[in-house]
């Protein structure tokens, strides 16, 4: 009886988790909004609403803002015009909270998650071929003592360096050609680089 109850609870948890995943259409719109929001952090500089500005923070912020309702109040507070925007997403209340409930490990969830935990507990491995990446996917590097994420935008990557000054907001955009020919080979995304772990996709997105 006890084992049967545990199995039922696990099954229900899986059903709930699956129901919160975005379908193919929602995932496409999520990517479009995610990329657009990330681009604005590059164009305008990091939003005052974006706390903990680093590489993982960019992903957390863009995902959280993507899942919100993008009404006129949101557009104004984020410095967006109403032109050239993706279609709005229809989401359940649970789906809108996905970026507030990251798996932090040890059975805990919350709005904050580190780069390594974002990859380990909240993403799925896609491969090491950059041609497999879709807009919004993450390119993950592990340097041993530190991990780093870049966001694939379709033709280039953007990322936050993890530090900023009065004259440098920390945001960077790098073309694929530049990335593949960097002198510092630790950051080249190919399978000959032991520091390049691979391309990862948020696990609530449809593959």
Where are the predicted features?
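Active-site scaffold segments
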Residues: 57-61, 149-152, 157-160, 173, ...
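Low-complexity, Gly/Ser/Thr/Pro-rich intrinsically disordered linker/tail segments
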Residues: 160-163, 170-207
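...with weaker cross-activation on analogous glycine-rich loops/strands in unrelated enzymes
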Residues: 81-167
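N-terminal capping segments
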Residues: 17-112
């Amino acid at each position: 009886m006890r084992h049967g109850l545990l199995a039922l609870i696990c099954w229900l948890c899986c059903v709930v988790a699956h129901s919160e995943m975005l379908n193919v259409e929602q995932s496409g719109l999520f990517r479009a909004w995610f990329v657009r929001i990330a681009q604005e952090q590059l164009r305008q500089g990091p939003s005052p609403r974006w706390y903990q500005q680093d590489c993982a923070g960019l992903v957390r912020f863009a995902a959280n803002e993507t899942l919100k309702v993008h009404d006129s109040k949101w557009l104004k507070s984020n410095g967006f015009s109403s032109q050239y925007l993706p279609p709005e997403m229809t989401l359940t209340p649970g789906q809108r909270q996905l970026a507030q409930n990251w798996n932090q490990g040890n059975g805990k969830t919350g709005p904050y998650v580190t780069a390594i935990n974002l990859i380990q507990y909240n993403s799925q491995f896609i491969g090491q071929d950059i041609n497999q990446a879709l807009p919004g996917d993450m390119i993950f590097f592990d340097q041993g003592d530190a991990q780093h994420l870049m966001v694939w935008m379709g033709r280039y990557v953007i990322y936050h360096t993890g530090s900023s000054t009065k004259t440098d907001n920390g945001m960077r955009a790098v073309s694929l050609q530049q990335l593949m020919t960097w002198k510092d080979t630790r950051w080249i995304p190919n399978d000959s680089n032991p520091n390049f772990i691979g391309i990862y996709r948020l696990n609530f997105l449809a593959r």
